[in-house]
Amino acid sequence: MWKKTISLMVISACMTGNVVAQGIVDVHCHNILPFYLEALEKHDAAMDEGFPLPAWDAGAHLKFMDEAGIGCSILTMPAPQPYFNDTEECQQTIRRYNEYCAKLKADYPGRFRFCASLPLPDVEAAVREAIYALDTLGADGVKLATNCRGQYLGDEELDPLMKVLDERHAVIIVHPHRPTPYSEKIITTTPLAMYEYPAETTRAVVNMLARNILVRYPNLKLVVPHCGSFLPLALPRMKSILPAMVAQDYMQPIDWEANLSRLYFDLAGNPTPEVLHSLLTITTPDHILYGSDYPYLPDAVLKANLQRLKQMLAADEELAPYREDILWKNAERLFEGNAIDER
């Protein structure tokens, strides 16, 4: 059976009252590499998401992690997908990115991990890259965009990729990308990250649920970003309408329990108590993970966000028992079987 072992080194434990604070695991952060940015600039796509991509380097990221008390960061490629109607160029950029991340993982053991990018919308190329990244490079999972030039998660054409990932018990980190197609008039007044990203994430996950992807491929685990996006609002409506849709043969039945049991949710986006409790209407505390969204906000802002989250968890009677789980233990369990070892 295909297995791999991950060892996440956590920072030294320190006592905070009666709580042992372990190194936090950050499941939502990005590294913007020079050759990736060059590929975007070549096609005038560096501003495709409506805002400039921030600078990144390993030293600055490690400094932030040390100051914030983060033991391990799981890196993913940001948006946009480097595909501009040239499959070979996309494959080369993504292969270079994955190999760079594998070297980072080797150079900084226990500090950096990565979920590989795949050269979608070319499904055959994505299957090849997934096998190489997971089997040879030691990727800790894969990152999938909500859509790649209009090819959405849950679409039937992605089934061969889902099969390969399922065979490897892969963790999939989802990240929103610009919707395709889209209206310029809709997104000119607000950045994509403000509204359209949560809508895009919700759209993609609903598409996967509607096709029972996580039931048909039961070894997959999916990390949904930004506090579940709009799913806490969308799922009750979807559940209420589904029986009528099934009765008229517009949709198939959905195994809600099985699907939702394979969804995990990161807290990137500075969650409030209201947001967290809304998220708990569709999941349980053992499926909630810390995410910073580094480096898209200044270090000081991200550290303040994390401090507020810690205080909020400590003060919340329902969530206080799960403080360490949310900050790092749930990430260990998520990658279990890829067993994250505590040191």
PLM regions and their residue ranges:
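Mid-to-C-terminal alpha-helical segments outside catalytic/metal-binding sites
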Residues: 2, 22-27, 31-72, 99-106, ...
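Bacterial N-terminal signal peptides
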Residues: 7-18
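Hydrophobic faces of well-ordered beta-strands that scaffold small-molecule active sites
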Residues: 25-29, 73-75, 113-116, 142-144, ...
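Active-site gating/metal-coordination segments in enzymes
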Residues: 77-205
